[in-house]
Amino acid sequence: MSELSYRRILLKLSGEALMGDGDYGIDPKVINRLAHEVIEAQQAGAQVALVIGGGNIFRGAGLAASGMDRVTGDHMGMLATVINALAMQDALEKLGAKVRVMSAIKINDVCEDFIRRRAIRHLEKGRIAIFAAGTGNPFFTTDSGAALRAIEIGADLLLKATKVDGVYDKDPKKHTDAVRYDSLTYDRVILQGLEVMDTAAFALARDSDLPLRIFGMSEPGVLLRILHGEQIGTLVQGRS
């Protein structure tokens, strides 16, 4: 195959991606399949970092709407991302990978604190880095956390795996005539309100000239194909 188009990537997975067909928690078969995909990408020569959401366990914003204090709910959501990060670490290590979980909040008995230089060093040494607890601040989603960490580690590409195979002009599950975009600018995504990531994450990536590819990860080998330059999903970059 061709040479890699990207040498350092950050892959954002939703917590829901770990559920499989279930309504809650982690499906071992699903997390093992995702772990295989990540290791395949690393073995091809890429430095790989991960951010995983926590929606399969807890959503702070949802309970805040029901009356829970938003800050408390967001802190609980951060802990959910740590649970998912540890689960992914276990799955990757069982396949022989060297992995470090780094948290934005202090939880030193189970993972490291996020320190930028240390995170980059882990990647340079061939370890997979999993960044947990978002930005460490309430009111910010794990999408924003993923964009921030990707910028901090100098990633060549931010990847967001979704349930659909890119960005559409309308919901493809509800509209059979929905059209998928091959590429978009950040300004157009924000202006049109295309809700595939939150606006803060889009703006952060735009202002740092970080390209973003949104794609579906249901097909085996898709991550490796993207690393080799295949135009899969929707590429978001630049300004209008």
Swiss-Prot record:
Pfam families cross-referenced by the UniProt entry: AA_kinase
InterPro entries referenced in this protein's UniProt entry, alphabetically: AceGlu_kinase-like_sf, Asp/Glu/Uridylate_kinase, Uridylate_kinase, Uridylate_kinase_bac
EC number: 2.7.4.22
Disulfide cysteine pairs (residue numbers): none
GO terms under biological process: 'de novo' CTP biosynthetic process; UDP biosynthetic process
Keywords of this entry: ATP-binding, Cytoplasm, Kinase, Nucleotide-binding, Pyrimidine biosynthesis, Transferase
Molecular function terms from GO: ATP binding; UMP kinase activity
Recorded superkingdom: Bacteria
Protein activity control: Inhibited by UTP.
Coiled coil: none
Enzymatic reactions: UMP + ATP = UDP + ADP
Subunit structure, as described in the record: Homohexamer.
UniProt-recorded name of the protein: Uridylate kinase
Source organism (scientific name): Xanthomonas axonopodis pv. citri (strain 306)
